[in-house]
Regions:
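Hydrophobic alpha-helical connector segments
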Residues: 45, 59-85
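Helix-turn-helix
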Residues: 3-41, 45
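Alpha-helical DNA-contacting segments of helix-turn-helix folds
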Residues: 44-50, 93
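C-terminal peripheral helix-coil segments that are non-catalytic and often amphipathic
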Residues: 81, 117-125, 151-188
Length: 188
């Protein structure tokens, strides 16, 4: 699965063959087909498992700490670690959605919506803002985290991790208006 994820991330799902995956994984076609029915099944596994891991962590953290600053800190750290240490599954998911079966796509979207909602509720409490403002902050944080692991040309992983953590802390600790309406610049 990891070999397939690396290939899908580097070349795109449509440009990777089962033969490419087998060669990268060091297995034969028949061995691969004992575990997966098709290349599409491999794609589903590549994106589904990491999304479920993120969601299960978020659920367990919320269960233990509620929608609190502690929950948000743990969500941010886990998301940063997942993006830096993982296979790029969220990037692949975002780019290859049309290659997924519709039923599976709907399920994955529901999981992502729940994941975002847990973040949003924790940000609302931590930053003392309404849910709409918290949702904007959630997307700003997660999209920034999701995009920066690709920029490791001159920095090592730990340097990127430190920058991402500092960025998240700066955003969360900023003095945010309580509502979206309060966020508009004066005179608008």
């Amino acid at each position: 699965v990891r070999s397939a994820a690396i290939l899908f991330r580097a070349h795109g799902y449509e440009h990777v063959s089962v033969e490419n995956i087998c060669a990268a994984a060091g297995v034969t076609g028949p061995a691969l087909y004992r575990h997966f029915k098709s290349k599409q099944d491999i794609l589903v596994t590549v994106v589904e498992e990491p999304i479920l891991v993120l969601l299960q962590f978020a659920r367990a953290t919320r269960e233990k700490y509620g929608s609190s600053p502690e929950t948000l800190d743990r969500l941010m750290k886990n998301h940063i670690n997942h993006m830096l240490d993982g296979t790029g599954a969220l990037e692949i998911f975002s780019r290859e959605q049309e290659s997924l079966p519709q039923e599976k796509m709907s399920e994955l979207r529901r999981n992502m919506v729940e994941y975002v909602q847990i973040w949003t509720e924790s940000i609302a409490v931590t930053c003392n803002v309404d849910l709409e403002t918290a949702r904007v902050l959630t997307y700003a944080l997660t999209n920034a985290i999701n995009s920066l692991p690709n920029y490791r040309r001159t920095l090592d992983k730990e340097q990127v991790r430190a920058i991402l953590w500092r960025m998240c802390q700066t955003i969360v600790q900023a003095d945010w208006p309580a509502t979206v309406e309060d966020a508009a610049p004066a005179g608008q």
